[in-house]
């Protein structure tokens, strides 16, 4: 009997989802993206070769896997073609194995221009977006004015819709933000040049997934960003523009929620965050700098340095509630090698003195929050590339067990290096 497994970030993104998707793809027929856009950077290292996928599902590196882009994903035609060409130049067959929902909203140059203009206007209060037009594209979707992949089938109607929406955007860009307008003809020509390639990959994603389930096929749903960046449940307004939680699978792919069997939450052995917003356990000392250095904490898409801090079990408890997480995969365990002590945030002290065990929702409710830590002995031994759990240092094992205790969720997979072979599967999500 086939299983449907969701892989998603349980923190603020950048947890190492791409590697784990790639690892588990060996046993699936389909890998599905259901939210986000090319603001996601999933880094895979296979046999020492590095690949960063932003829009195409990570299963594309497996020749027997079909990759699906669901309706919840915003698609930049330019970014999609660039990524396809990069993979095809390496001999990977993409367009024969990539299927796209016609309901995917399109990201076009005016979305990018608006994204940049808004961030510049916000100055120090900027959200910290990737500047790739994700938010404005989702806005158009909700406002019911957006262009979608399906619109590319009727080129005359597309041109007319584009003209109207570009007038709307250019009026704001020129008159309010005082920046250059986006050129209509160039935008139209660039999209039309690749329209046939994109429409050639359009398919009924919901029916494909339903048929696969009925045929007993394994399906993997690949999340982007992380739980605490969810548009509804994250640290609003310092969030992304899509539902990064498990509920986004159903709405973003058309797959019935009762058909999901297992939710794997990816967590780092510590915490990181890119951009603005609350981060209770953030470290500003030498320890934080050392974690960033050892963990090579720079964004795969933006190159921005990530903020680093101790493991936050309070935020994770919220992620467990939101996602009904079945088990964790802990990545970058080896980054904590060599520290005299390691810490776990087990509660927050609110400004009024109240002790809470679950993270607040809105960013404003995090102001003045203090972390309450448990301190555990660190380990000096090297855990890098260890693939036998029994060979881990005892203090490392104690740290893992304590995280399981304070969160109430088992750690089913451990990662001790960037390559997919540097992994320990303690409980197989497809057999759970």
Curated annotation (Swiss-Prot):
IMP binds at residues 14-17, 39-42, 130, 144, 225, 240, 304. It comes from the Bacteria. Binds 1 Mg(2+) ion per subunit. Keywords: Cytoplasm, GTP-binding, Ligase, Magnesium, Metal-binding, Nucleotide-binding, Purine biosynthesis. GO terms for biological process: 'de novo' AMP biosynthetic process; IMP metabolic process. One of its GO terms (molecular function) is magnesium ion binding. It is an enzyme of class 6 (ligase). Its cofactor is Mg(2+). One of its GO terms (cellular component) is cytoplasm. It is found in: Cytoplasm. The active site is at residues 14, 42. InterPro entries: Adenylosuccin_syn_GTP-bd, Adenylosuccin_syn_Lys_AS, Adenylosuccinate_synth_dom1, Adenylosuccinate_synth_dom2, Adenylosuccinate_synth_dom3, Adenylosuccinate_synthetase, P-loop_NTPase. Pathway: Purine metabolism; AMP biosynthesis via de novo pathway; AMP from IMP: step 1/2. It catalyses: IMP + L-aspartate + GTP = N(6)-(1,2-dicarboxyethyl)-AMP + GDP + phosphate + 2 H(+). Its EC number is 6.3.4.4. Substrate binds at residues 300-306. GTP binds at residues 13-19, 41-43, 306, 332-334, 415-417. The keyword S-adenosyl-L-methionine does not apply. Mg(2+) binds at residues 14, 41. Plays an important role in the de novo pathway of purine nucleotide biosynthesis. Catalyzes the first committed step in the biosynthesis of AMP from IMP. Belongs to the adenylosuccinate synthetase family. Homodimer. This is Adenylosuccinate synthetase. It comes from Haemophilus influenzae (strain PittEE).
């Amino acid at each position: 009997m086939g299983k449907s497994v969701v892989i998603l970030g349980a923190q603020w993104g950048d947890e190492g989802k791409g590697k784990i998707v790639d690892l588990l793809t060996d046993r699936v027929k389909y890998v599905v993206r259901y939210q986000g856009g090319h603001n996601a950077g999933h880094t895979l290292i296979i046999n020492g070769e590095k690949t960063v996928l932003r829009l195409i599902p990570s299963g594309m590196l497996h020749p027997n896997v079909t990759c699906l882009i669901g309706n919840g994903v915003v698609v930049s035609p330019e970014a999609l073609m660039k990524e396809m060409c990069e993979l095809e130049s390496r001999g990977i067959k993409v367009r024969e194995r990539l299927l796209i929902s016609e309901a995917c909203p399109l990201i076009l140059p005016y979305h990018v221009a608006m994204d940049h203009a808004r961030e510049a206007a916000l100055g120090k209060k900027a959200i910290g977006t990737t500047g790739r037009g994700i938010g404005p594209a989702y806005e158009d979707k909700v406002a019911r004015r957006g262009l979608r992949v399906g619109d590319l089938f009727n080129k005359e109607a597309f041109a007319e819709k584009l003209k109207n929406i570009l007038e709307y955007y250019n009026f704001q860009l020129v008159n309010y933000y005082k920046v250059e307008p986006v050129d209509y003809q160039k935008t139209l020509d660039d999209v039309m040049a690749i329209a046939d390639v994109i429409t050639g990959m359009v398919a009924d994603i919901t029916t494909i997934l339903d048929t696969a389930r009925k045929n007993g096929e394994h399906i993997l749903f690949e999340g982007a960003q992380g739980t605490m960046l969810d548009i509804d449940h994250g640290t609003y307004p310092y969030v992304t523009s899509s539902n990064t939680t498990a509920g986004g699978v159903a709405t973003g792919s058309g797959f019935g929620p009762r058909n999901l069997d297992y939710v794997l939450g990816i967590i780092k052995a510590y915490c990181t965050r890119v951009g603005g917003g609350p981060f209770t356990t953030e470290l500003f000392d030498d320890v934080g700098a050392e974690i960033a250095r050892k963990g090579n904490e720079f964004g795969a898409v933006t190159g921005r340095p990530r903020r680093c801090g101790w493991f936050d079990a309070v935020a994770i408890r919220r992620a467990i509630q939101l996602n009904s997480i079945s088990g964790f995969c802990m990545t970058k365990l080896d980054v904590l090698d060599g520290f005299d002590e390691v810490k776990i945030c087990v509660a927050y002290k609110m400004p009024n003195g109240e002790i809470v065990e679950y993270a607040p929702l809105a960013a404003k409710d995090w102001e003045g929050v203090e972390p309450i830590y448990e301190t555990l002995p660190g380990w000096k031994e090297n855990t890098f590339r260890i693939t036998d759990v029994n060979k881990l240092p005892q203090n490392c094992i104690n740290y893992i067990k304590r995280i399981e205790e304070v969160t109430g969720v088992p750690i089913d997979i451990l990662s001790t290096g960037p390559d997919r072979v540097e992994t320990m599967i303690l409980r197989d999500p497809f057999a759970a």
